[in-house]
């Protein structure tokens, strides 16, 4: 209702790339989540003054071109920090304890048919004492580090000059990015997608990693080659 008080509001649950221009024609304000507004589309929307990205990542918008056209672009940082951290932790617990594998085995009656009361299909690894490497120590990365610290993990992060003087309530070791790859038992990608971070995980860096290491990418897909 608050939006409708400001002007005419039209909501489209889903929009294909072919429908974007027609649906946005004449609009001064456009809100989007996954729908891409690139330079070509922006040029076809001369009335557009504001783009609101209903997410944290802004890679669906050509930010440089929007700025050149005088179009304001905003996003929603920090709205899902706890959810993302919980999701990362779920993956880490899943792989360290082989949750789904044991769940499937129990449902297939492997445990009741086992000769041993203690039923395991392999080594279960504790998170405590293992090393978590973080690429991107922004809001999500810092919250993840807090949780990992509470679980007894060693935390290392890729060196960021802007973070050097940041006082953190946990012990963290700053390292060159290649060394983070080499030392991590778990590697969490929490950086935005930029020209510098595109394919930050590549063949050369994968060769540096432990064969047992796990990569959890809750950022953009092309952070990984």
Residue ranges and their predicted role:
Residues 137-138:
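Glycine-rich Rossmann-fold phosphate-binding loop(s) that bind the pyrophosphate
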Residues 1-27, 156:
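N-terminal glycine-/charge-rich "phosphate-binding" loop or analogous flexible N-terminal tail
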Residues 141-142:
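N-terminal Rossmann-fold NAD(P) dinucleotide-binding loop
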Residues 13, 54-55, 71-82, 159, ...:
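Short beta->alpha connector loops at strand-helix junctions that form conserved
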Residues 59-71, 219-225:
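Rossmann-fold NAD(P)-binding glycine/threonine-rich loop
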């Amino acid at each position: 209702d608050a939006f409708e008080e400001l002007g005419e509001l039209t909501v489209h649950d889903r929009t294909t790339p072919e429908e974007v221009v027609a649906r946005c024609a004449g609009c001064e304000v456009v809100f989007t989540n996954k729908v891409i507004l690139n330079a070509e589309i922006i040029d076809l929307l001369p009335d557009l003054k504001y783009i609101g990205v209903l997410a944290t990542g802004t890679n669906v918008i050509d930010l440089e071109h929007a700025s050149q056209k005088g179009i304001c672009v905003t996003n929603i940082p920090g709205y899902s920090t706890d959810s993302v951290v919980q999701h990362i932790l779920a993956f880490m617990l899943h792989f360290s304890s082989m949750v789904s594998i044991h769940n499937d085995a129990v449902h297939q009656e492997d445990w009741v048919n086992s000769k041993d009361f203690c039923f395991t299909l392999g080594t279960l690894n504790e998170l405590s004492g293992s090393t978590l490497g973080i690429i991107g120590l922004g809001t999500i990365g810092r919250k993840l580090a807090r949780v990992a610290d509470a679980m007894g993990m060693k935390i290392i992060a890729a060196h960021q000059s802007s973070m050097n003087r940041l006082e953190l309530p946990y012990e963290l070791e700053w390292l060159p990015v290649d060394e983070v790859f080499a030392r991590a038992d778990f590697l969490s990608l929490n950086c935005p997608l930029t020209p510098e971070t595109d394919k930050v995980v590549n063949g050369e860096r994968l060769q540096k990693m432990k064969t047992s290491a796990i990569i959890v990418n809750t950022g953009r897909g092309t952070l990984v080659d």
